[in-house]
Amino acid sequence: MKKTLAALTVVATSFVITTPAAQAHIATPTWSAANSVSTGDQDAPAIATNRNGYVAVVWEDDRDTDNATDNVHSEIYLRTFRNGTALYEVKLSAGGSSGVTNWRHLHPDVGLDDKGNAVVVWQDDPDGNGYYNIPYRVVNTAGTVTASGSANTSSDGQQINPRVAVDPDGAPAGGAVAFSVVWEDIQTGTPATVKAAGYTGPTTRAWEVTASTTTGQHHNPDVAVSASGDAVVVWDDDGDANASYEIGLIRLGRTNGAATLSRRVANSNTGGQQTRPSVAANFNGDFAVAWESDHTGTAGSWTRSFTSTGVARFADVQVAAGGKAPSIGIDDESQTVVGWTVQATDLDVWVRGFGTDGTDAGRLSSQQLNSVPGGRQEQMTVAVSPYAQVAVAYTDDNDGNTYDQIYLGQDFSNNSW
């Protein structure tokens, strides 16, 4: 959009919801723009939060104004808040190599530890050759980059779609920033696989492994890390190469990347296509997954929750018919919130909360959650603190000029009390 909200601060009463049922739990967020500069096009937000009031948002920022659909010259920006107040905003990417005019930095993700340190990953092509690698940056609470590197050890082929998750209490507990990164690895003549790397310190890569099988196609990974440092990885899995995808799942150990939960399927309904998973884990290692599925004949978003030992609490639960690109967060009581995008007159963004029984009783009711009702809103992403505080971010084009910016909603709870 051509940013009418360059200095946006919207009161909670401006949000949009569907008509609630009796006793519904309706969110009342505090809204703001995550990006401080509204020139050009901001897309692909990701969000993280922690137990101490920090919220971090990253996005692609293309300040060209010639074509909103062209992501050439996109940079990666990070902005961090604490208790609703912005602490800093910083550009983490560095444009292109000398003489290169078609560079790109895309698909960012962010994680936070409990001290407020952020880890950001993205796919970068600074030399404009169409091949990507996965850089990372560690950023402290003052917005200073304290460590950097490349998550992938080999630059051969194509590395895309990275995600990151941060050990909440460091390694060892109370120690250095520790994190895990996953990405999709595509090598010439071989099927796409999912790679994972674990860091026990800001620059200490402890391991790199192939999380998926090496047969069939594997895409769109996500990762979540508990206080143990173990990483739960999910992805689109077609290990038997029959062109039907399920949600692959494995947990990898902090010290060496060995499986601490064997490779398996997260979804219980196996018909149709199961794709685009999102995963979240809490301090104790319980985790939950959301994904797209069309096994009923109609596409929608679904979810399932697991104990730290990998035992499912319930079979697949439908979040929303027609829901696309779900994002999930979890608190320390293993209650979850799922956000998604749905086709309406344009596109709208929604959220819904769940308890450990797979219902939304006492949790956020299914509701449209937009700051401004008009135009197109999409790419909803959700983060939940250990105390059930929720933060969301999404892209907004309420004036319909095709240029987006990033809206941030904070200060609401998944609990109804």
List where the protein language model places each region.
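Extracellular, repeat-based ectodomains that mediate carbohydrate processing or recognition
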Residues: A24-W417
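Secretory targeting and sorting signals
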Residues: M1-A24
